[in-house]
Amino acid sequence: QIQRDGFRAARRAGVKMVFASDAGVMPHAEVGRQFRIMTEYGMTPMDAIRAATRNAAEALGRESDVGTIAPGRYGDLIALAGDPTADVTLLANVPFVMKGGGIVKDAR
């Protein structure tokens, strides 16, 4: 409850949330659970997605080349079986990934 209250208080105060993956406290395959947790704590699915993309790029000072889809930026993409803005848990098990123009995962 303390973590949830702190998360909500930070959001109310205008703190920009960023999805993190390098804490080293959970197995890599479990990192996608953060999307579900963020929405349980009050974020919309799209806000949670932005935390993992645009906000993370801004936090790293890389917003000019990653974090959003735009001409001249790196275009790594994923494909899902449904709409993650309707079911954010889809992002915990991504079946298809393209990186640098090539397919790096295809579990469809």
Residue ranges and their predicted role:
Residues 1-83:
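His/Asp/Glu-enriched, well-ordered alpha-helical/loop segment
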Residues 86:
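Small/polar (Gly/Ser/Thr/Ala-rich) solvent-exposed segments
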Residues 97:
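Short aromatic-centered micro-motifs
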Residues 107-108:
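Extracellular/periplasmic ectodomains of large secreted or surface enzymes and adhesion receptors
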